[in-house]
Amino acid sequence: FFNMDTNDSHCTSLETNSSVALNFGGSPGSSDNMFLYDDSSMSDGSLYASDQENLSTPRKRSEYRRHHKRRLRCPQQQIQQRQAANLRERRRMQSINDAFEGLRAHIPTLPYEKRLSKVRVDRNAPDTMLSGVTNSQKLSHEQKKIIHKMPIKILLARQILDTTGIPTVEVDMVTELGLFRVGVPSTDVKKIAEAVQLRDNKPSEFAGKGVNNAVKNINTIIGPELIKQNLEVTMQKEIDQFMIALDGTENKSRLGANAIMCVSLVVAKAGAAKKGMPLYRHISDLAGVASIILPVPHITVIVGGVLSSNGLPFQEYMIMPTGASNFANAMRIGSEIYHYVKNSVSAKYGAQTSFVSHTGGMSIPLESHRDALMLLTDAIKQCGYIGKAEISINASATDLFKDGGYDLEFKNPNSNPQNYMSSDKLAEIYLDNMKEYPVCSIEDAFDFDDWAAWSTLTARTTNQILGNDLTQTNVRRVGLAVEKKAGNAIALRLNQSGTLTELIESYKLLQSNGFGVCVCDRWGDTDDLFIADLVVGLSAGQVKCGGPVRGERVGKYNQIMRIEEELGALAKYAGKNYRERPAGGKMHAKIWVPEDPRFLPRWPYADWSFNCI
């Protein structure tokens, strides 16, 4: 952990049990030798044995001090105690190093050392610089800047369960400020462009969905190698760059995006504590956001598609309280509409019909897409929120796409291919819904590779066309969506990008090109609240955490309300302007338009040079 020069006069080794004579020469008052003893034979303050009595109560201690005046220590005694304390600290740190030797022994030497050699860290590493420094040499100003106490002491990962019962990764990080913990969301749905979540693929354990390999990669590779670099936890970009280079693959398939992202997020938490500020403020600094905007929530009320066995083709029907006065009021509007729908359905179909899905929405036995829209529209009216609440639809059209068409009866194994819809016909359904009902946003309107349909629908409406599966938080696909004007807003998910830095770069790219941003949850979420601070820190304008039920969903909404309370008069709710860029600061982002994403380097990381300073 420390590179301590044993030749330094302030770090004199005291490894023997015999007394060691030290001549302090010009010590005031005496030139006699003094003797230092190994601390194994004494405890703190053992020079004064009478001070070590068991004074268990304040009264006893007070009486003792009154009758036993403490003797003043001479300079030699002060030096002696400092030397003993220094020895104890060195031994304590050595014991921690020894504890990690077992983990370091399992690091694959050949592939990872080769990969690390490509990352230019050796010339700035404190160990390298200090190894050649003697007592007579002085460190340069740049070298002094990076010599600091090791910020990361312990990095420990474990396998936990997400809210669907599927294993995911959790990481503990210990610094001088304490313990920080993050659990990343997971999913068993494989997308072609998102970073790879590493699974064990052992049928005998969790049906092959265990994450012990990802946990092992953190405990034996990422953790020890990251600790060696002696990087401050506030150096988010440098740490993320290091882990990307350590993995060495484009989609993070070697170490696992679930492993890398978990470490990236826990570093952000520790970095916020190091800077003495809330997590959302730290994220604002990382993203260059000057003013804080609280998001409009997409509150899931009804589910269909693959989330339900009902007849609804689209996956989610949500409420957006765009006319609310603040975020707390928005949650009140969403919750009241949710429970009105629940009570209405229970009265009509029975209480068992309001089954709650993984996302917190209700699986209501409706057979028509229009039935769901009519039910929500009536709920908005009956609750008195006309003009204050609008409807958002997550079509998840990739699930409907078959043989070049869209099958709205895809749940029926005997559906007729002649009834498959073209992109144009499906677009007409969306446009009609926007005219007849208060629908303001369509998410994943088409298949993620149906670029022409995305661009056409975006040009035909001013309402929000939100891409989620379209880009999968992949920087290349985000750039392609910007170039083709496919949609006017993009969803960002934590575990799809791989690192917090990559997610922030995607956000900057979208904002600089006038796209809206929605920070989204996943089915297999955890009780971690990071997403709440993320959406506030980015001033994204929109957040999607599911329904106003289930602990992992409500916890995130509650955290945003706490942040709003903390901000007080400075809190600004996005409202109708949920797609607009936050005012008050520049979004320093490159406008990147790829010619052919298959043959381009991984922007913006192709020319990264790792620098500790």
Model-derived features: where do they sit?
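Basic DNA-binding helix
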Residues: 60-132
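Intrinsically disordered, low-complexity transcriptional effector regions
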Residues: 1-79, 130-142
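Short, Gly/Pro- and small/polar-rich lid/capping loops
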Residues: 146-168
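Catalytic core of soluble alpha/beta enzymes
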Residues: 353, 363, 370-592
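Short beta-strand elements
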Residues: 169-177, 182-186, 299-321, 378-380, ...
